[in-house]
Amino acid sequence: MKKMIDNSSLKLLAMLAMLIDHIAWVSFPLATNMNILSPNWLANSMHIIGRLAFPVFAFCIAEGYRHSHDVSKYMRRLGLLALISIIPFSLMGWVTGLGFIMQNTVVTLFLGLCALYYSDQQTATWRKVLIILLCFTLSIIADGGLTGGVFGIYAFAKIKDPIFRKIGGVLALNSVQILILAFNFSYDGLVDLAATCLLFLLVTSFYNGQKGANIGKVFYWFYPLHLLALSLFRIAFLLFLM
């Protein structure tokens, strides 16, 4: 099978998936408020596509860590992006947890990168584990809910075999959801989990390990600007309905 997707292409696919998901989150609640019939199948389909975004971004963060010549600079950029994105993310109406203090997905990606970097500075296993658990705890606050993002990023970076890296990483990424399903099973939850894992594994099966074009700045601008544009659209519609 020819592997034609490089790292830059993966990021672009993840950005597109994220945009589709966020458009669904903004558009369908507005349609409901305007008493317009909302086709649930379309909203659900858009959200399923959107499920691809976070695992791919997590995978790319791990790849960036493994191949970066200046990890501290990489961390500063991602941390700055997380801070810049706080306001547009909050304007989207997705404020939970500690609200404007953190509250966006990039924080979880940043914490996953921190877990990798700072745990690798330690020699004692207990210190490594403590750092990873601390970053995981902070990610719960950042996302306003339980997520295994930090575990997934760590697994993507540390598992040696390329195939097991993807499988182990996406399972670690969804470890909390798997644990919840084990104790509180739901068919919808299982379908959502399976769709996320299978879609990620399908797309990354075409990954060739190459860096590709330098689009770092595209992602750093895209994330806050697309949130800002969608939040302004949402606010304008809500004002129109008043």
In which residue ranges do the predicted regions lie?
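Alpha-helical transmembrane segments and their immediate juxtamembrane cytosolic regions
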Residues: M1-M242
